[in-house]
Amino acid sequence: MGKFGRLDAGVQKTVSGRAYAYCSSVTDLTDEHMPPSSWFIDPKPDNMLTVPACRGCNAAFGRDDDEFRLSLGAVVGMDTPETIEFNRTKVMPGVIKNRRQTRQVLGSTRLLMRTASGASTFGEAALFRVDFGLFCRVGQRLARGLYRFETRTSLPADTPVEVGRVGDPAPYLERIFKGAKFREKGPAFAYWHVIVDDLPTHSVWLFDFYSWLFMIAITGGLIGNLPDET
């Protein structure tokens, strides 16, 4: 299954009949794009998803948004017109502006052999590893935000959220997400999710970034039921 991380749970709150995804603020409220709009190439999809959040939370997420965008650009590479455009318009401007972030990403690079369908080698490429703490924070935020979007409620404070990287999504799509609800927002992002009917805080989410980076998030402790990729 690989490495998983658990982060602190968020807080459930309702203000004037609205549940907020991240904090208990009742002032200076806004809608946050989920995922952040800066991870999408232009033209952006119609009807991008939003969840209610305060401006303070939005501002606090800014650094993670920037660092994950840079890391995502390195991970997805430049193998398709969409990933080329993403790197050209969304990643390179940040590389120029923030040399520290660039050094962090390049410092996690190693050479690997890339294979076609897990079989014949067809070349070498650089493998970029996203900082695991950043990876977990992004996954937890996506799970909580999209849970809020799908259910119109927020996960309770004591609900654990675990996050892991998926190399091959096929076992999950076949065994966990077969027939699951699916949403796609252009080439940049798609997700599948299953929420347990009689245990509504228990859910599993599979996030797809540019059909290259796959992330799974589990709320409520379902990790023992996931398929083994090996």
Where are these regions (language model features)?
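Short flanking/linker segments adjacent to small metal-binding domains or redox-active Cys/His motifs
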Residues: 90-132
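Polybasic, low-complexity binding patches
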Residues: 59-95
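C-terminal, charged low-complexity interaction regions
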Residues: 120-230
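Zinc-coordinating Cys/His ligand positions in small cysteine/histidine-rich zinc-finger domains
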Residues: 54
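Exposed alpha-helical structural elements
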Residues: 66-70, 101, 134-137, 141
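Histidine-centered nuclease catalytic patch
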Residues: 19-50, 61, 66-67
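Short, charged/polar micro-motifs that form catalytic or ligand-binding hotspots
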Residues: 10-13, 44-47, 128, 132
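Short, charged surface segments at domain edges that flank catalytic/cofactor-binding sites
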Residues: 1-19
